[in-house]
């Protein structure tokens, strides 16, 4: 009985992050994340602070929680804090909400729990889904969230893909493998983390890893206890 209980507990503990990651719905490519990979989480934290925190807050996440992913207080203060000198403060956006509404037409949402509400696969697909669309106010659109107000802040890393336009300057659509109408895209230029092969194929492995690290951190941020839970799960398995 005790052995069965341990096995059941371990299975539930290990399955919880996977179930959370699948909650986003939609036909998105699955992304494998490892909340125990501290190097990945640290890279993701750096990407988040340098790019996302300009406009988005993470008001339920305090800077000192980053110690949980292996960073020291000095590393946090010297590399990840730009708007406060108190390590116990929460992650607030650099941009004033009123300015954000004026420039983007809406206040960018808080990202603390976005991975839990939308799912890891959704976030990973969103980070890879930006494309140039001259019909949009910001000049950008997204395959995962059509008519998104957000510009592509990671375009320098990913490069630029653009929607094909018809004779009237309107986006060309096509059906995907699931029969859904999607924009017909083509790559225009590579970025710092992408390249074209000699045969013209677009290689984005490094950018995909970059997006995976950011997704991993956002998944951790939505549920910091998942690292401990997964460790407990493996310990329980080892004693069965």
Residue ranges and their predicted role:
Residues 39, 43, 47, 118, ...:
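Extracytoplasmic/secreted proteins, especially bacterial periplasmic and envelope-associated proteins
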Residues 71-143, 148-176, 189-207:
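Electron-transfer interface patches adjacent to heme c in soluble/periplasmic c-type cytochromes
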Residues 198-236:
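Short, aromatic-rich amphipathic segments at membrane interfaces
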Residues 240:
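Conserved small/polar residues in nucleotide/adenosyl-binding loops
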Residues 21-46, 57-68, 76, 222-230:
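Electrostatic cytochrome c docking/interface patches
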């Amino acid at each position: 009985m005790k052995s069965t209980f341990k096995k059941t507990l371990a299975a539930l503990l290990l399955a919880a992050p996977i179930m959370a990651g699948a909650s986003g719905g939609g036909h998105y490519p699955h992304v494998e994340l490892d909340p125990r990979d501290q190097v990945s989480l640290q890279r993701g934290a750096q990407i988040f602070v340098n790019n996302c925190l300009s406009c988005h807050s993470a008001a339920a996440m305090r800077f000192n929680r980053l110690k949980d992913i292996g960073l020291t207080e000095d590393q946090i203060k010297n590399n990840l804090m730009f708007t406060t000198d108190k390590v116990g403060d929460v992650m607030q956006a650099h941009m004033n909400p009123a300015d954000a509404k004026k420039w983007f037409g809406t206040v960018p949402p808080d990202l603390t729990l976005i991975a839990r509400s939308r799912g890891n696969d959704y976030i990973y697909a969103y980070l890879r889904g930006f494309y140039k669309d001259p019909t949009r106010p910001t000049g950008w659109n997204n395959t995962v969230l059509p008519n998104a107000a957000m510009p592509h802040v990671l375009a320098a890393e990913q490069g630029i893909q653009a929607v094909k336009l018809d004779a009237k300057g309107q986006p060309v659509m096509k059906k995907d493998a699931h029969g859904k109408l999607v924009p017909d895209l083509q790559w225009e230029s590579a970025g710092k983390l992408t390249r074209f092969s000699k045969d013209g194929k677009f290689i984005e492995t490094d950018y995909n890893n970059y997006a995976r690290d950011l997704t991993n951190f956002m998944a951790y941020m939505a549920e910091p206890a998942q690292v401990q839970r997964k460790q407990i799960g493996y310990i329980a398995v080892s004693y069965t």
